Regions:
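Exposed alpha-helical structural elements
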Residues: 17-21, 64, 82, 171, ...
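Composition-driven low-complexity repeats that form or flank extended alpha-helical/coiled-coil segments
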Residues: 2, 9-10, 205-206
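Intrinsic-disorder-associated interaction segments
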Residues: 11-18, 22, 46, 58, ...
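A cross-kingdom feature marking solvent-exposed beta-strand/loop segments within repeated
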Residues: 36-60, 66-71, 82-84, 148, ...
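Short, structured motif recognition centered on aromatic/hydrophobic residues
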Residues: 57-60, 64-73, 117-121, 164-167, ...
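Terminal low-complexity "docking" segments
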Residues: 5, 9-42, 47, 51, ...
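Surface-exposed interaction/gating patches
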Residues: 113-165, 169-174
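Repeat-associated, polar segments at repeat-unit boundaries in modular proteins
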Residues: 65, 70-111, 179-206
Length: 207
């Protein structure tokens, strides 16, 4: 198993420790993703991977994170790579023909109930991200496009859908329960604001 360098880890609270365990599991899976064009440079960019994933998880509560950790451990026991699956689900939108022929038969099937919950969460996350974009357009201009899949590019919305489809029903329900009542204009609790604040702090900026 490939491990994250301990020197770069934020480890101030029990939640930080939980997030670090999750990132270790994801990093090992990310390292093992195979690409048709060969190994991607980002697979060796440990710092950026750590910052991006830690920032995302900083916006989630411990109950949801604990459930997601169990999803990762279950996948590990079954010999599944949830990061590979995430990219596979995204290809339903970026390369539908390849997805239908090569990936759909081998990816874990997503039930109609799970599909509906994924869509509800992804749309909430899109609303949160739009609120951040409206507040900080110059900063958001450096991020993924919000929607669409032009020229094979994965938007924020499609990336969210791909990742959410790898989560268990239990984890999705905990996720939805956490974010369903948040006002997108509430900068303290809107997860997009939390994520971006955490990211900028890693790079030495303060809001």
């Amino acid at each position: 198993m490939r491990y994250i360098n301990d020197a770069m880890k934020k480890n101030d609270t029990p939640k930080d420790g939980l997030i670090n365990r999750i990132i270790e599991l994801e990093w090992d899976m990310f390292d093992k993703v195979t690409n048709t064009g060969g190994r991607a440079a980002c697979q060796d960019d440990e710092w950026t991977f750590y910052v991006m994933r830690f920032s995302q998880f900083s916006a989630l509560n411990e109950a949801m994170l604990q459930s997601y950790e169990q999803d990762l451990l279950q996948a590990q026991r079954e010999g599944r790579n949830m990061v590979t699956e995430k990219y596979g689900y995204m290809m339903e939108y970026t390369d539908p023909a390849y997805f239908d022929k090569q990936l759909k038969p081998v990816l874990p099937q997503v039930s109609p109930a799970k599909e509906e919950l994924v869509d509800r969460i992804a749309n909430l996350l899109l609303g949160f991200e739009k609120a951040f974009d409206a507040r900080y357009p110059a900063l958001y201009s450096k991020s993924r496009p919000l929607q669409g899949a032009e020229a094979g590019n994965v938007s924020f919305h499609l990336y969210a859908i791909g990742e959410l489809k790898t989560y268990s029903q239990r984890t999705l329900e905990l996720y939805y329960r956490q974010i369903a009542g948040i006002d997108p204009k509430d900068e303290e609790h809107n997860p997009s604001f939390v994520i971006h604040r955490t990211t900028t702090a890693f790079y030495g900026y303060t809001s």
